[in-house]
Curated annotation (Swiss-Prot):
The keyword Hydrolase does not apply. GO terms for cellular component: nucleus; perinuclear region of cytoplasm; transcription factor TFIID complex. The TFIID basal transcription factor complex plays a major role in the initiation of RNA polymerase II (Pol II)-dependent transcription. TFIID recognizes and binds promoters with or without a TATA box via its subunit TBP, a TATA-box-binding protein, and promotes assembly of the pre-initiation complex (PIC). The TFIID complex consists of TBP and TBP-associated factors (TAFs), including TAF1, TAF2, TAF3, TAF4, TAF5, TAF6, TAF7, TAF8, TAF9, TAF10, TAF11, TAF12 and TAF13. The TFIID complex structure can be divided into 3 modules TFIID-A, TFIID-B, and TFIID-C. PANTHER family: TRANSCRIPTION INITIATION FACTOR TFIID SUBUNIT 8. The lineage of its organism: Eukaryota, Metazoa, Chordata, Craniata, Vertebrata. GO terms for molecular function: protein heterodimerization activity. This is Transcription initiation factor TFIID subunit 8. It is found in: Nucleus; Cytoplasm. Component of the TFIID basal transcription factor complex, composed of TATA-box-binding protein TBP, and a number of TBP-associated factors (TAFs), including TAF1, TAF2, TAF3, TAF4, TAF5, TAF6, TAF7, TAF8, TAF9, TAF10, TAF11, TAF12 and TAF13. Interacts with TBP, TAF1, TAF6, TAF10, TAF11 and TAF13. Component also of a small TAF complex (SMAT) containing TAF8, TAF10 and SUPT7L. Forms a heterodimer with TAF10. Interaction with TAF10 is mediated mainly via its histone fold domain while interaction with SUPT7L is via its C-terminal region.
Amino acid sequence: MADTAAGPGGSGTRPGSKQSTNPADNYHLARRRTLQVVVSSLLTEAGFESAEKASVETLTEMLQSYISEIGRSAKSYCEHTARTQPTLSDIVVTLVEMGFNVDTLPAYAKRSQRMVITAPPVTNQPVTPKALTAGQNRPHPPHIPSHFPEFPDPHTYIKTPTYREPVSDYQILREKAASQRRDVERALTRFMAKTGETQSLFKDDVSTFPLIAARPFTIPYLTALLPSELEIQQMEETDSSEQEEQTDTENNALHISTDDSGAEKESASVLQQSSSLSGSRNGEESVIDNPYLRPVKKPKIRRKKSLS
């Protein structure tokens, strides 16, 4: 004999076989194992102690085809009578049409040497949590049949604002402002430490606790004491204008003295007095820098020469 079939509580597949992760494949595999357990139980009741794997697979395929044919025929009889779900009468008619004696079923079910097959364990599928849940689902009103689809989730048609109300608590606002200020200071300190010169508290590790290097600052009030470029330019312009006026007055005095050389003695004495006055005035003008504080210049009158 080759491979032996499993007992009533076992299966006909090898223990080291790979199992599929697809739910449909798992369902077909579980159904196939259940049929193999049924075939093994029937063989044990018939007195067989072992069986080849090929024979067990053949009997399993025959049992599966027989059950599938009963279900297909029962459904066709059900739809023929304008119904959606088959009943016991449909199954009885199917068995009669297939040549099975229905009267022997009660005696076969009550046999003494029959073996009880435990139901396979049912694993519940993991429930996927819904992303949005708001409120409770509405049940169907009495006038809507139960086979109709359920109402959609309430979050699909209920207004659910997503914005948050502004916080008005004074303590929370102060804490938030303080934390923002602290974060800004830390970010600015790190930026200055990365871009500029730094000093470290530890000689071995320079990158630990970097400090911004201290730089000597100039005297803050020194710029207010020093004259600006505009003031220096104005001072130079006033000095040049004063020098030009002084040269003009000297030239006029010399010209007047040469013209009046042939005048009379009285006129010469008057001219000397006027020249001395003009010299004193020029000395005063050279001393006074402000043009608004200088004395007013009177026009000089020239006397005509008398015919002798």
